[in-house]
């Protein structure tokens, strides 16, 4: 028997147990080996870490991932366990060998149930760089991710959805597109992510308007009531192993296309999507047209294997879209476009995407219909219905969407006929200001890309979360310009 010491430490996802070297060597286990911790009413598998002082002999230290959601007694039994067979399957992939759907399913199952360490699971992701997953392996991975969670079904068909692979500051088309398409009578169970490296995700923006965290049962009720949802996927038991894989990919920014494809399509498949429109902005993430076309083809191929119609739009992702970057500022853009105003570039792209999705739903008059639903206010009414169903205030106004009060303005130092922004600098500035954690932090672009500006005219306003963040922003701006070299006025005659 071992005494239990609950440690206020997180391992980053791995179920770890910390043992004294004396106890570990006595059991013939070493670092990264596995042990089973068991007691009268339960058990778990944990990965061993060794120490000399933190945990004395006769005691096991449990990280928060192990004890936080379990009723573990003060004393437990511990015994050594062999490495799971899935470790060998990962080694096969690293050696360039294809693996069967059954082996992929077992790897995903073991990741889901914490039988693999984070290092071992990360090697599975990295194996896609050694040799790209085949079409069959991509399908097997996607289906295994879906099988590890629950699936939803909606009575009203067809079920439509859209996804953007990201990389463009602002670009908050999703709430507008979903509202337009749902206003046309289609079912759109949209779930979105929070920001990881960007200034805001769709979930962060929607949290400005309403609750975004729901159970699977609640999501079904919302969609059946409002015709659509704009919820956070992380609170749902839909493809939960994908969230584990995303955490593994984040530290080294591992983003192999096969895992990107499986991640996106697994979550769409889990909510019963039949027709999916993918937006691939060519710019930061996808560098050229050849790469964009290849990725589009792979999306369509995998979608077909899953019985899903996938259509892809390759769009220009080199410049930000909309006036705002950051949760509240982007929420303001969304509200203004739905109310018939707002930035023209965001409106135009939203109409383009909505028309494509309506066309996929069988509406040949898709362009005219999308514009009519937006201009008539029907899309706005649908957005309000979604907000209400999600527990928010459907009568929210721009004045209710409060910005941070620490402000820094940046003005043009010369006349320019066509302003172009450095998206990477804008992203860094917005995160330095406090977004997405501080909802009212971000950047407002007074001049949209391509617009003309006079010397001394205000270009950008930064809203920072506090004095310290404001100072960080100001220091950064002394070394980096958010404006790229662009067309300047040489002479006025």
Question: Where are each of the predicted segments found?
Answer:
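A glycine-rich helix N-cap at a beta->alpha junction
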Residues: 205-229, 297-303, 307
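General beta-strand structural signal in soluble alpha/beta enzymes
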Residues: 161-162, 188-192, 215, 230-234, ...
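Active-site-proximal beta-alpha loop/turn segments in soluble metabolic enzymes
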Residues: 125-129, 162-163, 202-205, 240-250, ...
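Long, compositionally biased stretches
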Residues: 1-95
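Phosphate/diphosphate-binding glycine-rich loops and adjacent basic-rich segments that engage nucleotide
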Residues: 226-273
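Glycine/serine-rich anion-binding loops at beta->alpha junctions
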Residues: 159-182, 186-198
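Acidic, glycine/proline-rich low-complexity segments that act as flexible tails and inter-domain linkers
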Residues: 81-169, 208, 382-390, 493
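Well-ordered secondary-structure scaffolds
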Residues: 96-106, 111-113, 151-153, 255-256, ...
């Amino acid at each position: 028997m071992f005494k239990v010491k609950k440690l206020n430490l997180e391992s980053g996802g791995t179920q770890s147990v910390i043992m004294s070297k004396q106890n570990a060597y006595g059991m013939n286990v070493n670092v990264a080996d596995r042990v089973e911790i068991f007691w009268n009413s339960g058990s778990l598998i944990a990965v061993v870490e060794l120490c000399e002082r933190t945990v004395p002999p006769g005691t096991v230290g449990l990280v928060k991932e192990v004890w936080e959601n379990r009723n573990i007694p003060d004393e437990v039994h511990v015994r050594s366990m062999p490495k799971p067979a899935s470790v060998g399957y990962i080694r096969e992939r690293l050696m360039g060998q294809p693996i069967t759907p059954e082996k992929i399913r077992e790897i995903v199952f073991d990741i889901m149930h914490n039988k693999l360490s984070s290092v071992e699971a990360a090697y599975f992701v990295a194996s896609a760089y050694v040799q790209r997953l085949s079409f069959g392996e991509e399908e097997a991975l996607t289906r295994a991710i879906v099988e590890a969670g629950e699936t939803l079904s909606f009575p009203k068909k067809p079920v439509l959805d859209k996804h953007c692979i990201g990389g463009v500051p602002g670009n908050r088309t999703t709430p507008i597109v979903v509202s337009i398409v749902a206003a046309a009578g289609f079912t759109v169970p949209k779930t979105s992510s929070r920001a990881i490296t960007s200034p805001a995700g769709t979930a962060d923006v929607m949290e400005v308007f309403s609750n975004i965290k729901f159970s699977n049962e609640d999501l079904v009720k919302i969609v059946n009531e409002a015709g659509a949802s704009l919820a956070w996927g992380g609170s749902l038991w839909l493809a939960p192993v994908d969230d584990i894989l995303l955490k593994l990919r984040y530290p080294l920014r591992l983003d192999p296309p096969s895992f990107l494809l499986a991640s996106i399509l697994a979550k769409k498949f889990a909510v019963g999507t039949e027709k999916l429109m993918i937006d691939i902005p060519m710019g930061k993430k996808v560098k050229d047209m050849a790469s964009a076309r290849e990725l589009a083809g792979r999306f369509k191929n995998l979608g077909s294997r899953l019985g899903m119609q996938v259509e892809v739009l390759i769009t220009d992702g080199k410049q930000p879209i909309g006036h705002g970057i950051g949760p509240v500022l982007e929420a303001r853009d969304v509200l203004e476009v739905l109310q018939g105003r707002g930035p023209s570039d965001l409106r135009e792209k939203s109409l383009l995407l909505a028309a494509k999705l309506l066309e996929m739903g069988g509406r040949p008059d898709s362009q005219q219909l999308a514009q009519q639903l937006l201009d008539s206010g029907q899309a706005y009414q649908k957005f309000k219905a979604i907000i209400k169903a999600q527990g928010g205030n459907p009568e929210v106004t721009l004045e209710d969407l409060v910005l941070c009060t620490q402000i820094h303005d940046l003005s043009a130092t010369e006349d320019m006929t066509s302003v172009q922004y450095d998206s990477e600098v804008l992203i860094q500035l917005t995160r330095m200001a406090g977004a997405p954690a501080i909802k009212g932090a971000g950047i407002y672009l007074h001049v949209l890309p391509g617009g003309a500006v006079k010397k001394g005219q205000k270009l950008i306003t930064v809203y920072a979360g506090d004095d310290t963040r404001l100072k960080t922003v100001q220091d950064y701006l002394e070394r980096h310009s958010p404006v790229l070299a662009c067309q300047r006025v040489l002479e006025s005659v």
